[in-house]
């Protein structure tokens, strides 16, 4: 994986963490982004080194998800199984799906397959079970919905 791809992968992971924090604590966007810039991205915390991330890409994902939350949640909800709601999803999974859906909607420069693959990898960082497959199927379906030609 080249350096640009690695820094974008790190940005995606950090964005999911930031979105999770926002969901849990309602941290204001400017404060949230500042905290990640200053204390997370590229930092060493409890002997774990956070990779250098593509900071503008991180910012775009976090700000974009929060600015377009209703549109993103509608796209996700449209592909959930009958009887499922956003509220039923694990908060980490919500953050993963929201970030991935934002990229599918707003980042036409990133191929659908790359978005899906990257967020499946993020899901694998947080979950051991079927969740990665769930993220794969949902993001693939959303990609087909939003990138129709």
Curated annotation (Swiss-Prot):
Pfam families: NusB (PF01029). It comes from Sphingopyxis alaskensis (strain DSM 13593 / LMG 18877 / RB2256) (Sphingomonas alaskensis). It comes from the Bacteria. GO terms for cellular component: cytosol. This is Transcription antitermination protein NusB. GO terms for molecular function: RNA binding. Keywords: RNA-binding, Transcription, Transcription antitermination, Transcription regulation. GO terms for biological process: DNA-templated transcription termination; transcription antitermination. Belongs to the NusB family. Involved in transcription antitermination. Required for transcription of ribosomal RNA (rRNA) genes. Binds specifically to the boxA antiterminator sequence of the ribosomal RNA (rrn) operons.
